[in-house]
C-alpha cells in the first residue's frame, strides 16, 4: 500500500507551497520588495500568520481560491481538502506584543508546524497546543524572531524530527538576520542540504532530528 506523501517547496523567507493529493496550500507570501523574486503561485488556500504585507502577507503575486488569516481563527481547527489546519497564538515580542499565529497543518499522516513570525520561546501552554510535530518549518534567522538556542529547545519540546529552516538571511534580503549556516553550526544532529522541493511521507520520519536545508526557489540570481 502506497503512503500519501507531501511535497514541500521552499519559495523564500517564510513562504512554502505544500502539495498533497493534487491540492495546494501556500503559507505567508512575501513582497518582492524584500529581495526575493515574486512568489507567482496558484494555491487553493493561502494561510497568513499575521498582517505584514512586506514579509508575511503580500497577496499581489498570489492566485488563490481563498485566504485564511490565522489571527481570525486562533484555537480553531478547520479542513481544506486534505489539509487540516489549527492556529496557535504566539507573539512577535513578549509580553503579548504583535499577535501572531503558528499554523499546525495535518496532511498525509504528518503534522507540520509553521512558526509564523514568533519572537519568543513558546510557553508551555503554547507548546502543549502544538502536540507532536513531525516537520517543523523553523525560524532560523534569530534577529526579530526567537533566539536560536530557544529554537533548539522548542525542537526538543515538540519532538520535531524533520526541521526545515526558513526566515534566514540571504544575499540581497532587506532584513539583517542570520544566515542558515549559523543554525547549521549549532545543530547537534545530522544536516542535509538539498534542492527547493522535498517530498516526505510518514515512513521517512526518523528517530533522530534531522535538519533539512532547502534552497529558496525564488532566490534572485
Language-model features: locations:
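Active-site-proximal loop/helix segments of hydrolase catalytic cores
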Residues: 92-158
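Divalent metal-coordination and catalytic microenvironments
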Residues: 18, 46, 85, 117, ...
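Active-site metal-binding motif and surrounding structural segment of the metallo-beta-lactamase
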Residues: 32-76, 128-137
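Active-site environment of divalent metal-dependent phosphoester hydrolases
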Residues: 32-36, 51-57, 120-123, 143-149, ...
Amino acid at each position: 500500500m502506497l503512503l500519501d506523501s507531501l511535497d514541500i517547496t521552499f519559495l523564500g523567507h517564510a513562504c512554502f507551497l505544500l502539495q498533497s493529493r493534487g491540492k495546494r496550500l501556500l503559507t505567508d507570501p512575501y513582497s518582492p520588495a524584500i529581495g526575493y523574486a515574486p512568489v507567482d503561485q496558484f494555491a487553493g488556500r493561502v494561510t497568513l500568520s499575521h498582517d505584514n504585507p512586506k514579509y508575511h502577507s503580500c497577496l499581489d503575486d498570489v492566485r488563490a481560491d481563498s485566504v485564511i488569516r490565522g489571527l481570525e481563527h486562533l484555537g480553531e481547527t478547520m479542513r481544506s481538502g486534505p489539509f487540516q489546519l489549527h492556529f496557535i497564538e504566539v507573539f512577535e515580542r513578549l509580553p503579548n506584543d504583535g499577535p501572531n499565529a503558528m499554523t499546525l497543518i495535518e496532511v498525509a499522516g504528518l503534522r507540520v508546524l509553521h512558526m509564523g513570525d514568533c519572537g519568543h520561546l513558546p510557553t508551555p501552554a503554547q507548546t502543549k497546543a502544538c502536540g507532536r510535530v513531525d516537520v517543523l518549518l523553523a525560524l532560523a534567522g534569530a534577529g526579530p524572531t526567537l533566539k536560536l538556542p530557544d529554537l533548539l529547545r522548542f525542537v526538543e519540546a515538540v519532538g520535531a524530527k524533520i526541521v526545515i529552516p526558513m526566515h534566514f538571511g540571504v544575499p540581497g534580503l532587506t532584513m539583517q538576520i542570520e544566515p542558515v549556516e549559523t543554525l547549521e553550526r549549532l545543530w547537534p544532529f545530522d544536516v542535509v542540504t538539498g534542492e527547493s522541493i522535498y517530498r516526505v511521507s510518514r515512513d521517512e520520519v526518523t528517530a533522530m532530528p534531522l535538519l533539512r536545508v532547502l534552497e529558496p526557489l525564488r532566490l534572485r540570481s
